[in-house]
């Protein structure tokens, strides 16, 4: 027993070195991308913004079928028609992911009409863009139901079949605000932090589940209607990401079976700074960059 423990202590650092070297090599040498031709993809919030771009990207990369969920039928119809014109089978369903029973009922309808979902992209989200004391209680609940609990319900609806098939992928379109919150978006930041913890736990829980993986994407501010009006102090230094960039990198992460994706790569510095700098220094960074007041001009989706 003692020798086994000593052996484990010796092997563990060697294993860590091997994994670090392997990851470094992967950054230099192109890896083989996963074939999507047999995959059925479901995207929540798929009618517009990043969701629409994700549908385009999956279609361009050969996904077999694409299913869109959302609450606005006009947007869902437009995106569905566009994907069909690209030559990919596409369907849409009206579904509020914040409503548990509606999620389960719609998931059943999807299985009956389309078949098994093998890639689930949890993209649906809302933001009210207010401080705690200025926020309506119902609005706060809505954010948590859609942004966080909605992922519980969709994952519970589709993961069991993925485990049976030993083929599946759960994707969470999160936000860098899950790691570094800002004033004026307390509902959104809280829900995204919760969703990040959810995915971190889920990813670890899938380690012994062959063929089923998870990916969490943490993008910086993206130029969509959702955060319309948001302004940082130095827009040339901190330009918003394009939705098509986020979509392309997200699908690539799925094909590479990448567990965590921070966009842009400079956001890795944020993780390091938060772990070593004192709170006072972090507060000065918020003030200097303009994230302290960036929601003052927030308008949101109109």
Curated annotation (Swiss-Prot):
Instruction: Reproduce the miscellaneous comment text.
Output: Located in a region of chromosome 1 which is often deleted in aggressive neuroblastoma tumors.
Which ranges of the sequence are coiled-coil? none
Does the record bear Nucleotide-binding in its keywords? no
Bilayer topology reads: Multi-pass membrane protein
- Taxonomic lineage of the native organism: Eukaryota, Metazoa, Chordata, Craniata, Vertebrata
Q: Where does substrate bind?
A: 175
User: What keywords does the record list, in alphabetical order?
Assistant: Lipid metabolism, Membrane, NADP, Oxidoreductase, Transmembrane, Transmembrane helix
Q: Name one GO biological process term.
A: cardiac septum morphogenesis
User: Which InterPro entries does the annotation name?
Assistant: NAD(P)-bd_dom_sf, SDR_fam
Return the GO cellular component terms, semicolon-separated: endoplasmic reticulum membrane; lipid droplet; photoreceptor outer segment membrane
Protein task: Catalyzes the reduction of all-trans-retinal to all-trans-retinol in the presence of NADPH.
What EC number(s) does this enzyme carry? Answer: 1.1.1.300
Question: Hey, what tissues is this thing expressed in?
Answer: Widely expressed with highest levels found in heart, placenta, lung, liver, kidney, pancreas, thyroid, testis, stomach, trachea and spinal cord. Lower levels found in skeletal muscle, intestine and lymph node. No expression detected in brain. In the retina, expressed in cone but not rod outer segments.
Query: Does the keyword field hold Transport?
Result: no
**Gene Ontology molecular function: any one:** all-trans-retinol dehydrogenase (NADP+) activity
| Gene name tied to this protein | DHRS3
Q: From the record, give the transmembrane residue ranges.
A: 9-29, 170-190, 195-215, 253-273
User: Which compartments is it annotated to reside in?
Assistant: Membrane
The record's similarity note reads: Belongs to the short-chain dehydrogenases/reductases (SDR) family.
Instruction: Please name the SMART domains in this protein's record.
Output: PKS_KR
Cysteine-cysteine disulfides: none
Q: What is this protein called?
A: Short-chain dehydrogenase/reductase 3
